[in-house]
Regions:
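Well-ordered secondary-structure scaffolds
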Residues: 1-272
Length: 272
């Protein structure tokens, strides 16, 4: 049986799913854009697009330039990641499942015929129409649930509450320009501390806490672009360097959906 799963996106939430499926014995191929913009970079396999190779919780991902390089990575226990914005891998690499984990809040071109089993994470997908199932990505009671009909909860634009803070903990650019980071992931910051600049415009910490994520230095950003994330829980600095509870819950939903699909195939009930 084919054990290959193609995953669109290598950001921090996608990384939870990628890591989970890899550890469960699936061969995972990650598709990314040329210059990813993850801010929780210490736990995002997408960083391999810049550094060539990255490691999250002991699992390595390696940038490749040809689909033919995937097998060598899998044999070495490494996750291959390639620049493939149009998902050409769907035609080039035999696989049984496709997961759109870009968390773009919209469909970037995923269709239900891209694999035997197609999963979409978060809003932007309709189960039974452009994907087989959707996984809920909004914090709360339904996080990680499998949706077989309809869509995930719509994006509100308001971050989930952590330590009593919601929108205050996520920082967006006030102007377009080139991002220049000053603080680093894991730094303890105070409200009002200078943590970055966009061109010459200063970016200040919005609350006291741990800088959980900050955009890669030197990237151009538009106005109102997400550039940093502060965790108000000062005692949990190590969380900056491990896959989040949210990412793990989503990963559990994806794994459960795939296991259900495989069981249905064995019993003759699944779509082939």
């Amino acid at each position: 049986m084919n054990k290959t799963i193609i995953i669109r996106g290598g950001g921090d939430l996608a990384t939870g799913t990628i890591s989970c499926l890899h550890q469960c014995g699936y061969q995972v191929l990650v598709l990314e854009i040329a210059k990813p913009t993850a801010i929780r970079r210490s736990v995002a396999f997408s960083e391999a697009m810049y550094d060539g190779e990255t490691e999250v919780e002991g699992i390595k991902a390696r940038k490749i330039t040809q689909f033919s390089e995937t097998k060598a990575c899998w044999q070495d226990g490494i996750i291959p990641i390639i620049c493939d914005e149009k998902a050409e891998a769907v035609k080039a690499v035999p696989h049984f499942a496709f997961v759109d984990a870009a968390i773009a809040k919209r469909n970037l071109g995923t269709t239900i015929d891209m694999a035997d089993y197609v999963i979409g994470l978060g809003p932007g997908f309709t189960a039974g129409v452009d994907v087989d199932v959707v996984i809920e990505t909004k914090r709360g009671h339904r996080l990680g649930r499998i949706i077989r009909e309809g869509q995930a909860i719509a994006n509100t634009g308001i971050p989930g509450i952590i330590g009593g803070y919601g929108k205050e903990r996520v920082i967006h650019s006030e102007n377009a320009g080139v991002f220049h980071g000053i603080a680093h992931i894991g730094d303890l910051v105070k409200k009002g501390d200078l943590i970055a600049k966009v061109d010459d415009a200063p970016v200040y910490a919005t609350l006291d806490g741990v800088l959980r994520g900050i955009l890669r230095d030197g990237l151009p950003v538009p106005e109102h672009f997400k550039i940093a994330d502060i965790d108000p829980r000062l005692s949990e600095r190590e969380n900056c360097f491990t896959i989040s509870d949210k990412a793990s819950a989503i990963a559990g939903g994806v794994l459960r959906a795939i296991c259900i699909y495989e069981n249905e195939l064995r019993s003759g009930e699944g779509r082939k």
